[in-house]
């Protein structure tokens, strides 16, 4: 049976002191010949000490020819004859002696959970799993943990070798640009995260953009729905968690947009970092207006050439030389497209408000019924939150209210992404754009203040220049 030691109780401690977590534990032990160690481990397993990160057999400090076999701490015996039969027989056969051995356990031995349990009041649970963003541990502590937040941060920093900075999310959130206000609890003041997800490298300032490592599974799920060389419109792209893997692994051409200038800055940098300039075109504009002009931009030769005129990157050349996988179709620099170009998928990952942007699809294909078939209409993946009892019905009803018509057979699925808080779920509704909505007479949607669409598009040559400037500023 595994034995778990516990550190000394330090209830209410708010400033970390390693010395307060030192403890001594005296255990029964058999002093055995060194050559009998292997036999002892094989035959006495049910009677010896089994504890995390502790050796069962240690050197005898008084004689190198002998070893100390540490026994189950719960065993009560003052002499050999008091031992259970297997131990007694082994001891008599090998002339072993029953002794006491003291082990010293210090702060470094205890896990973060053990340390925090010894500190926090009994009625408080230790904080659950935290999000890791590169070298940053991201906590979301509730109010009752506020008196202990700094010591919690220090313990996590001490016990996680890859963590250099521990931050706590504050209540304030920037609703326009979707990033959280944070405070540093422990470690260095460095919010520039570097990480790898979905086979792509990402770099960004975590304090200025939105990133959630817990959504990697959702990123992967959506990307698996894309086909090779699909045209993708990522309306709220952030720093590229959907756009980059889709371009790299599915060879999709992605129009990726984000309103946050900082997200846009790092999106451009990450495109260059992953050598995906021939696959992703970045935009920095309001999501509603981006949707409204997406089809026009896709069929604008000047805009399309921003990608097609790019020289193939080394990644493109390597991929095009590969013939090892018979399941992957031969790849060209760009998908061969005749007639009207149209996106296969729209991704709308802005859970708090994405549903409100669905009105932008009204009349998107107006006047194109002769050249666009119903089967060509895109699939929309719209992320949202719900705290309703029936979340699926709630999401469907909200979408139908915004688009002004029932989804009917156009509904594909409502996928449960994760529970973000008690009685609050994140979901993704996927549906085909209804033809009645797509081909309707367009509504006039006002542009949001400060939008100048000609300046919102950044060419890939500008991306390279901008990224170079970014790197210079960061050094």
From Swiss-Prot:
GO terms for molecular function: tRNA (guanine(37)-N1)-methyltransferase activity; tRNA methyltransferase activity. S-adenosyl-L-methionine binds at residues 219, 258-259, 286-287, 349. Its EC number is 2.1.1.228. GO terms for biological process: tRNA N1-guanine methylation. SUPFAM superfamilies: S-adenosyl-L-methionine-dependent methyltransferases. GO terms for cellular component: cytoplasm; mitochondrial matrix; nucleus. Residues 306-328, 456-475 are annotated as: Disordered. It is an enzyme of class 2 (transferase). Monomer. Specifically methylates the N1 position of guanosine-37 in various cytoplasmic and mitochondrial tRNAs. Methylation is not dependent on the nature of the nucleoside 5' of the target nucleoside. This is the first step in the biosynthesis of wybutosine (yW), a modified base adjacent to the anticodon of tRNAs and required for accurate decoding. This is tRNA (guanine(37)-N(1))-methyltransferase.
